[in-house]
């Protein structure tokens, strides 16, 4: 018997894959603008000149999103890196 502790390895898998990677999503810009506009209207009254800037920003934001100019959904790259580094994680035997 040798004094070495046993080496624990991952079970043999065809590939290492994360099923549902978590991706951070940014807040919808149009939703934030609409909230600010409604708050402005509740403070200063409907169609107040102080809120005119928010109205134009909200209109431009909604027209851009209607035309499809919004950002594409960002895909997670965790599975790419897991596949790339699987041999290092698994620890192939050196014998």
Swiss-Prot record:
Q: Name one Pfam family in it.
A: CHCH
Q: Which of UniProt's keywords are assigned here?
A: Disulfide bond, Mitochondrion, Ribonucleoprotein, Ribosomal protein
- State where the protein is found: Mitochondrion; Mitochondrion matrix
Question: Residue numbers of motif Cx9C motif 2?
Answer: 51-61
Q: Which domain of life is it from?
A: Eukaryota
Q: What is its main location?
A: mitochondrion
What the entry lists under InterPro entries is as follows:
CHCH, Ribosomal_mS37_fun
- Per the record, the coiled-coil ranges are none
- Enumerate the Gene Ontology biological process terms: mitochondrial translation
**Motif mapping: Cx9C motif 1:** 30-40
Q: Which positions form S-S bridges?
A: 30-61, 40-51
| One of the record's GO cellular component terms | mitochondrial inner membrane
- Claim: Transit peptide is one of the keywords in the record: no
GO molecular function terms attached to this record: structural constituent of ribosome
Q: Where is the CHCH domain?
A: 27-69
User: What is known about what this protein does?
Assistant: Component of the mitochondrial ribosome (mitoribosome), a dedicated translation machinery responsible for the synthesis of mitochondrial genome-encoded proteins, including at least some of the essential transmembrane subunits of the mitochondrial respiratory chain. The mitoribosomes are attached to the mitochondrial inner membrane and translation products are cotranslationally integrated into the membrane.
Q: What else is known?
A: Present with 259 molecules/cell in log phase SD medium.
Identify its protein family.
Belongs to the mitochondrion-specific ribosomal protein mS37 family.
Q: How does it assemble?
A: Component of the mitochondrial small ribosomal subunit (mt-SSU). Mature yeast 74S mitochondrial ribosomes consist of a small (37S) and a large (54S) subunit. The 37S small subunit contains a 15S ribosomal RNA (15S mt-rRNA) and 34 different proteins. The 54S large subunit contains a 21S rRNA (21S mt-rRNA) and 46 different proteins.
Q: What is this protein called?
A: Small ribosomal subunit protein mS37
- Specify the species: Saccharomyces cerevisiae (strain ATCC 204508 / S288c)
Top-down, what is the taxonomic lineage of the species of origin?
Eukaryota, Fungi, Dikarya, Ascomycota, Saccharomycotina
């Amino acid at each position: 018997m040798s004094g070495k502790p046993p080496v624990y390895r991952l079970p043999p898998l065809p590939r290492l894959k994360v099923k549902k990677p978590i991706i951070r999503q940014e807040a919808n810009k149009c939703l934030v603008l609409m909230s600010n506009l409604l708050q402005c209207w509740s403070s200063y009254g409907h169609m107040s000149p102080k809120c005119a800037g928010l109205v134009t920003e909200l209109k431009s934001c909604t027209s851009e999103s209607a035309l499809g100019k919004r950002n594409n959904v960002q895909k997670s790259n965790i599975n790419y890196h897991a596949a790339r580094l699987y041999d290092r994680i698994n620890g192939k035997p050196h014998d």
